[in-house]
Amino acid sequence: MSALEKSMHLGRLPSRPPLPGSGGSQSGAKMRMGPGRKRDFSPVPWSQYFESMEDVEVENETGKDTFRVYKSGSEGPVLLLLHGGGHSALSWAVFTAAIISRVQCRIVALDLRSHGETKVKNPEDLSAETMAKDVGNVVEAMYGDLPPPIMLIGHSMGGAIAVHTASSNLVPSLLGLCMIDVVEGTAMDALNSMQNFLRGRPKTFKSLENAIEWSVKSGQIRNLESARVSMVGQVKQCEGITSPEGSKSIVEGIIEEEEEDEEGSESISKRKKEDDMETKKDHPYTWRIELAKTEKYWDGWFRGLSNLFLSCPIPKLLLLAGVDRLDKDLTIGQMQGKFQMQVLPQCGHAVHEDAPDKVAEAVATFLIRHRFAEPIGGFQCVFPGC
């Protein structure tokens, strides 16, 4: 649920489909596995990557909200992971396994409001201020007055929320900040194209396997391993569908509308409702969140983000899928040494899913360089050239 075209630069809300002419290059090459071999698009449970799951209750003026978190690790600093728009905490699954094997740290991957399995009283409020407060409230609920050292790591929308959280001092024990493929300039440029991208996505899927297959073949996620666990957090069963009779019984072809003879409007309306129900039966999965309806918040997530990021008085890391992502403010800041930057080429917008080992290596090196964490085994830091 989140993807954006290269023509939009960084689809700042969801992850974007493959770069024109290349989306197929990496994923397409992997698709051709020889005669008689089929790729496995079946979903994988979160428990293969995280050690535990917890629903954190937070009291606020609107009532009690419940935030889903997935956790791993028992010592070292906490890496608090914030996903992009439309994604969920499960997008960090493969990265979690990779980083835990490199440095001593604890992982807390959070489903932001209206995403994943988090349940809030006011799910329509996706303002940067509200979501930043959510992050602070979850930290307080989990750790009380003595939170451990925490590094915020966010992808796309989650990166913006991480910056807003840091700049508002909502996490008192914050020691570091990492943004993944989110830059104010390119994000703002992409907003005009975002609705067109969202309209171009499938509205429904006939099974979880179908959703996973689409995410990989469209280039939204270029890593099948990650897609098999991540897409489970992006889609849900359509309302009114309690239990499909299994993916094998679901129609494989595309439902085609029959041409109708002229009839009364009442008859047509009745038939349309019946068609909608049939569509739900045959395509029982849809997106968990309608990103198009969050448009009024997009500007608030990203406007002023570069200066907010630069002003945070803590060590900072910026990971990008391409050097062309940098805007003027960040280019100047990078030249002045205000943050560490690393470019991870041959990735789509979902950098941490497409190249989880490379992202884990970059984050682990950052943690060790600043003496925030201890390496595990024979992990060797690889210092980037930029």
Swiss-Prot record:
Residues 268-280 have a biased composition (Basic and acidic residues). Coiled coil: none annotated. It catalyses: [phosphatase 2A protein]-C-terminal L-leucine methyl ester + H2O = [phosphatase 2A protein]-C-terminal L-leucine + methanol + H(+). PROSITE patterns: LIPASE_SER. The modification Omega-N-methylarginine is found at R16. It is an enzyme of class 3 (hydrolase). Pfam families: Abhydrolase_6 (PF12697). Residues 254-265 have a biased composition (Acidic residues). It comes from the Eukaryota. One of its GO terms (biological process) is G2/M transition of mitotic cell cycle. One of its GO terms (molecular function) is protein phosphatase 2A binding. Residues 1-38, 254-280 are annotated as: Disordered. GO terms for cellular component: nucleoplasm. Demethylates proteins that have been reversibly carboxymethylated. Demethylates PPP2CB (in vitro) and PPP2CA. Binding to PPP2CA displaces the manganese ion and inactivates the enzyme. Binds PPP2CA and PPP2CB. This is Protein phosphatase methylesterase 1. It comes from Homo sapiens (Human). The gene is PPME1.
